[in-house]
A protein has these predicted regions:
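A short beta-loop-alpha structural element at the N-terminal edge
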Residues: 2-14
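Conserved GNAT-fold acetyl-CoA-binding loop/helix
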Residues: 15-40
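A short helix-loop-beta-strand connector motif used in the catalytic cores of GNAT acetyltransferases and
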Residues: 41-53
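Conserved acetyl-CoA-binding loop-helix of GNAT-fold acetyltransferases
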Residues: 91-104, 131
Length: 148
Protein backbone atom coordinates (compact mmCIF):
# COMPACT_ATOMS: atom_id res chain seq x y z
CA UNK A 1 0.00 0.00 0.00
CA UNK A 2 1.33 3.37 -1.02
CA UNK A 3 -0.02 6.85 -0.30
CA UNK A 4 1.31 9.45 -2.72
CA UNK A 5 0.34 12.74 -4.37
CA UNK A 6 -2.07 12.29 -7.26
CA UNK A 7 -0.65 12.57 -10.76
CA UNK A 8 -2.38 13.75 -13.91
CA UNK A 9 -2.34 10.13 -15.08
CA UNK A 10 -4.48 9.18 -12.05
CA UNK A 11 -7.39 11.41 -13.06
CA UNK A 12 -9.25 8.87 -15.18
CA UNK A 13 -9.17 6.31 -12.34
CA UNK A 14 -10.17 9.00 -9.84
CA UNK A 15 -13.20 9.84 -11.99
CA UNK A 16 -14.17 6.16 -11.98
CA UNK A 17 -14.03 6.18 -8.18
CA UNK A 18 -16.01 9.43 -8.01
CA UNK A 19 -18.76 7.78 -10.04
CA UNK A 20 -18.61 4.72 -7.76
CA UNK A 21 -19.02 7.04 -4.76
CA UNK A 22 -21.98 8.77 -6.40
CA UNK A 23 -23.72 5.41 -6.81
CA UNK A 24 -23.04 4.60 -3.14
CA UNK A 25 -24.41 8.01 -2.14
CA UNK A 26 -27.55 7.36 -4.21
CA UNK A 27 -26.81 10.20 -6.63
CA UNK A 28 -25.28 8.65 -9.77
CA UNK A 29 -26.75 11.33 -12.05
CA UNK A 30 -25.25 14.17 -10.03
CA UNK A 31 -21.71 13.74 -11.40
CA UNK A 32 -21.64 16.15 -14.34
CA UNK A 33 -17.99 17.23 -14.37
CA UNK A 34 -16.09 16.11 -17.46
CA UNK A 35 -12.72 14.40 -17.29
CA UNK A 36 -11.21 17.35 -19.18
CA UNK A 37 -12.56 19.88 -16.66
CA UNK A 38 -11.45 17.67 -13.76
CA UNK A 39 -7.91 17.40 -15.16
CA UNK A 40 -7.63 21.12 -15.91
CA UNK A 41 -8.93 22.02 -12.44
CA UNK A 42 -6.29 19.91 -10.74
CA UNK A 43 -3.35 20.04 -13.12
CA UNK A 44 -3.85 23.16 -15.24
CA UNK A 45 -2.03 26.48 -14.87
CA UNK A 46 -4.16 27.45 -11.85
CA UNK A 47 -5.02 24.29 -9.89
CA UNK A 48 -7.95 24.59 -7.50
CA UNK A 49 -7.71 21.10 -5.98
CA UNK A 50 -5.03 18.71 -4.77
CA UNK A 51 -5.26 15.02 -4.03
CA UNK A 52 -3.46 12.03 -2.61
CA UNK A 53 -4.07 8.50 -3.78
CA UNK A 54 -3.93 5.09 -2.13
CA UNK A 55 -2.32 2.56 -4.41
CA UNK A 56 -2.33 -1.21 -3.96
CA UNK A 57 -0.24 -3.33 -6.34
CA UNK A 58 0.05 -0.39 -8.73
CA UNK A 59 -3.72 0.29 -8.88
CA UNK A 60 -5.35 3.35 -7.32
CA UNK A 61 -7.91 1.98 -4.85
CA UNK A 62 -8.78 5.23 -3.11
CA UNK A 63 -8.06 8.92 -2.89
CA UNK A 64 -8.66 12.09 -0.93
CA UNK A 65 -9.26 15.36 -2.79
CA UNK A 66 -9.09 18.71 -1.04
CA UNK A 67 -8.85 22.44 -1.62
CA UNK A 68 -8.14 25.51 0.47
CA UNK A 69 -11.12 27.16 2.11
CA UNK A 70 -10.87 30.50 3.88
CA UNK A 71 -12.80 31.23 7.05
CA UNK A 72 -13.02 34.81 8.27
CA UNK A 73 -13.16 33.34 11.78
CA UNK A 74 -10.48 30.65 11.52
CA UNK A 75 -8.23 31.46 8.53
CA UNK A 76 -7.07 28.92 5.95
CA UNK A 77 -8.60 25.50 6.32
CA UNK A 78 -8.44 22.33 4.27
CA UNK A 79 -11.80 21.44 2.75
CA UNK A 80 -11.96 17.70 2.16
CA UNK A 81 -14.19 17.31 -0.88
CA UNK A 82 -13.93 13.53 -1.12
CA UNK A 83 -12.20 10.72 0.68
CA UNK A 84 -13.02 7.29 -0.64
CA UNK A 85 -11.76 3.78 -0.93
CA UNK A 86 -13.20 1.46 -3.54
CA UNK A 87 -15.57 -1.10 -2.05
CA UNK A 88 -13.27 -4.03 -2.86
CA UNK A 89 -10.39 -2.47 -0.89
CA UNK A 90 -12.29 -1.33 2.21
CA UNK A 91 -11.31 -2.64 5.62
CA UNK A 92 -7.60 -2.79 4.83
CA UNK A 93 -6.60 0.52 6.42
CA UNK A 94 -6.42 2.64 3.27
CA UNK A 95 -8.91 5.20 4.60
CA UNK A 96 -6.86 5.59 7.77
CA UNK A 97 -3.65 6.03 5.77
CA UNK A 98 -5.32 8.67 3.60
CA UNK A 99 -6.78 10.55 6.58
CA UNK A 100 -3.49 10.42 8.47
CA UNK A 101 -1.66 11.84 5.45
CA UNK A 102 -4.24 14.64 5.17
CA UNK A 103 -3.49 15.53 8.79
CA UNK A 104 0.22 15.76 7.92
CA UNK A 105 -0.49 17.95 4.87
CA UNK A 106 -2.77 20.23 6.91
CA UNK A 107 -0.09 20.68 9.59
CA UNK A 108 2.67 21.28 7.02
CA UNK A 109 0.55 23.99 5.36
CA UNK A 110 -0.41 25.50 8.73
CA UNK A 111 -4.11 25.10 7.99
CA UNK A 112 -6.23 25.75 11.07
CA UNK A 113 -8.31 22.63 10.54
CA UNK A 114 -9.95 20.22 8.14
CA UNK A 115 -13.66 20.47 7.32
CA UNK A 116 -15.95 18.24 5.27
CA UNK A 117 -19.47 16.92 4.93
CA UNK A 118 -20.86 13.46 5.49
CA UNK A 119 -24.33 12.18 4.70
CA UNK A 120 -26.31 11.63 7.88
CA UNK A 121 -27.16 8.04 6.89
CA UNK A 122 -23.55 7.07 6.12
CA UNK A 123 -22.87 5.31 9.42
CA UNK A 124 -19.64 3.59 8.30
CA UNK A 125 -18.12 6.97 7.40
CA UNK A 126 -19.43 8.64 10.56
CA UNK A 127 -17.93 5.89 12.70
CA UNK A 128 -14.63 6.20 10.82
CA UNK A 129 -14.52 9.97 11.42
CA UNK A 130 -15.27 9.61 15.13
CA UNK A 131 -11.81 8.19 15.77
CA UNK A 132 -10.41 11.58 14.71
CA UNK A 133 -12.34 13.48 17.41
CA UNK A 134 -14.53 14.95 14.67
CA UNK A 135 -17.14 17.53 15.65
CA UNK A 136 -20.47 16.95 13.91
CA UNK A 137 -22.45 20.16 13.39
CA UNK A 138 -26.23 19.80 13.25
CA UNK A 139 -26.84 23.56 13.32
CA UNK A 140 -25.74 24.72 9.86
CA UNK A 141 -27.77 24.07 6.70
CA UNK A 142 -25.99 23.44 3.39
CA UNK A 143 -26.85 25.92 0.64
CA UNK A 144 -25.94 25.99 -3.04
CA UNK A 145 -26.86 27.67 -6.31
CA UNK A 146 -26.21 25.87 -9.60
CA UNK A 147 -24.79 27.92 -12.49
CA UNK A 148 -26.07 25.96 -15.49
Amino acid sequence: MTIRPALLTDCERMMQLIKELAVYEKAPDQVTVTLDHFVTSGFGSNPVWWAIVAEVNGVVQGFALYYIRYSTWKGQRMYLEDILVTEAARGKGLGTLLMDELMVIAKQNKFTGIVWQVLEWNEPAINFYKKYRTKFDAEWINCSVEMN
